[in-house]
Amino acid sequence: MFVLVNLKAYPCDPVAIAEAAADVAETTPATIAVAPQPADIGRVADTGATTYAQHVSPTEHGSHTGSVLAESVADNGAVGTLLNHSEHRRRLADIDGSVAAAERAGLDTVVCANNPAQVAAAAALGPDAVAVEPPALIGTGTPVSQADPDIVSDAVAAAEAVDPSVDVYCGAGITTGEDVVSAGDLGASGVLLASGVAKADDPRAALADLVAPL
């Protein structure tokens, strides 16, 4: 099971959360990754935690002011990146370019999608994984595996029909170990979450609870 904690732009301590993630990851067969703000990637990677970017741009070296260069992300210690999160939606052509940029830099890719149809389109771009996240459930604490389990199983089937090598994750409302187990039961091989850890009073305890049943 792959657990990706997106810190978004929350006012949290990314290094402390990364240290907790690295420690908890040693107690479980699950992989726990942390996606901090771009400026924090190096510090987070230095903790030994599996580190992802929140986005990379579909650009190469050159005159691209404001772009997040995949090579820079990799040089600072990230091993993967999110793409097309619901809060940072991109056009399909740009997602394709970002997947290519990430692959060029040796980064794993997780492309987010809102529904099974978008999952199929994302899978056709050849990422390492796609993640289905209904926007209405993001940050609610109500897990997608409980509120709309069919969207997870349908997303798994949609990706399988396009490219069986693409992993399927689910997100939105994931906060407990039970949520993670339910996602796996529906066919997902990973989960995305944010506020359940980034806004927790005790992020280490929240992480431990997430992976305890695994």
Swiss-Prot record:
Gene3D superfamilies: Aldolase class I (3.20.20.70). Its main location: cytoplasm. Substrate binds at N6, L7, K8, I138, G173, A194, S195. One of its GO terms (biological process) is gluconeogenesis. One of its GO terms (cellular component) is cytosol. The keyword Cytoplasm applies. InterPro entries: Aldolase_TIM (IPR013785), TIM_sf (IPR035990), Triosephosphate_isomerase (IPR000652), Triosephosphate_isomerase_arc (IPR022891), Triosephosphate_isomerase_AS (IPR020861). It comes from the Archaea. Belongs to the triosephosphate isomerase family. Involved in the gluconeogenesis. Catalyzes stereospecifically the conversion of dihydroxyacetone phosphate (DHAP) to D-glyceraldehyde-3-phosphate (G3P). NCBIfam families: PRK04302.1, tim. It catalyses: D-glyceraldehyde 3-phosphate = dihydroxyacetone phosphate. Pathway: Carbohydrate biosynthesis; gluconeogenesis; Carbohydrate degradation; glycolysis; D-glyceraldehyde 3-phosphate from glycerone phosphate: step 1/1. The lineage of its organism: Archaea, Methanobacteriati, Methanobacteriota, Stenosarchaea group, Halobacteria. It is found in: Cytoplasm. This is Triosephosphate isomerase.
